[in-house]
Regions:
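Bacterial N-terminal signal peptides
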Residues: 1-8
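Preference for long, amphipathic alpha-helical scaffolds in soluble/luminal domains
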Residues: 12-311
């Protein structure tokens, strides 16, 4: 199966790109995409945004699995982690499906509950904003919410969580690469607000200073591919060229740094020594970062701006 996928991708005679190679690997590894973080929502999101030709049946299988899961759970994907809704909304939007009507349930409605979304921490806020903005969705009324959310409330929540020296973190007092990059992704659409623009510039300065001499990034003590992938997505969402001098160290760009983690199979590893083997999360994040680069290079809307699908 993998061979046939790769042959079909290279049939045009052009050298296979890393994007094509990884797309083939992912589809071969996950024959039936399910619901969830790995081998599901992010995989579908990445494939749909990559521009790679994917059989419609593959996306249909995913959607049918989402419908079944939503029906089985009576519309409640999680009572605690509202990123479950956000991630599903992003994947559904990417394949042109309406998240407001899935097996009779509106998956946008939970994202209108400000307290429940933010209770999860900064991740909840980041991905609620990305999900709502992905298709320029109106925030529906949520009669069960103690506080009805607005976009500006989520933007302000992110601004209040900025660290004194710039950047953002999940816990503690030092800026975290991944969280800072993801926050910048969510704020990218709001840069016309002076406070947001200033916070974004501080965040970019932090990411530039945290970049290693080899062009990579360290998070939780190890140089890893996921952190590099998130920085790439942040830069492309903000329209910052990947060869911007702030993000080139010793001649190495963030794209160069990411590709160091690529394996011959098309997979990516979490850490450079490959000690964890081919890694599902690392591969999916690297893949959608490559999709973000491809979209920037070909003049398409950004990875998270899915208004092109809505037209």
């Amino acid at each position: 199966l993998l061979l046939s996928l790769l042959l079909s991708l290279t049939a045009c005679g052009k050298p296979e790109t890393q994007l094509e190679k990884t797309a083939g690997y992912l589809q071969a590894q996950v024959a039936e995409p399910g619901v969830g973080s790995i081998g599901g929502d992010w995989l579908i999101f990445g494939l749909a945004r990559s521009g790679i030709k994917v059989p419609q049946k593959y996306f249909d299988t995913y959607y049918n699995n989402v419908e079944a899961a939503v029906r089985e759970k009576n519309g409640v994907l999680s009572e605690r982690k509202y990123t479950e809704y956000s991630r599903t909304v992003l994947a559904l939007t990417a394949i042109g499906k309406d998240p407001a009507s899935v097996a009779g349930f509106n998956l946008l409605r939970p994202l209108a509950d400000f307290e429940q979304v933010t209770k999860q921490g900064i991740n909840g806020t980041i991905f609620a904003l990305l999900a709502l903005d992905s298709g320029n969705y109106e925030i529906p009324e949520n009669p069960n919410a103690a506080v009805q959310a607005t976009r500006q409330m989520y933007v302000d929540e992110l601004l209040t969580r900025e660290l004194p020296d710039g950047g953002w973190t999940l816990t503690g007092g030092e800026a975290d690469v991944d969280i800072t990059a993801m926050t910048l992704q969510a704020l990218a659409k709001y840069r016309e607000q002076p406070e947001v623009e200033a916070a974004v510039e501080r965040g970019l300065a932090v990411l530039s200073s945290l970049q290693e001499p080899d062009g990579g990034y360290v998070s939780w003590g190890s140089s890893n591919s996921e952190s590099v992938a998130q920085v790439i997505v942040a830069l492309t969402e903000l329209g910052v060229p990947l060869d911007d001098e702030r993000f080139v160290k010793n001649g190495v760009t963030v794209e160069d740094a990411l590709l160091r983690f690529a394996q011959e199979s098309g997979a990516f590893v979490h850490v450079l020594d490959g000690s964890g083997g081919d890694d599902g999360m690392a591969t999916e994040q690297a893949f959608y970062a490559l999709a973000a680069i491809h979209r920037a290079e070909t003049g398409k809307t950004t990875l998270y701006d899915m208004t092109d699908v809505m037209q």
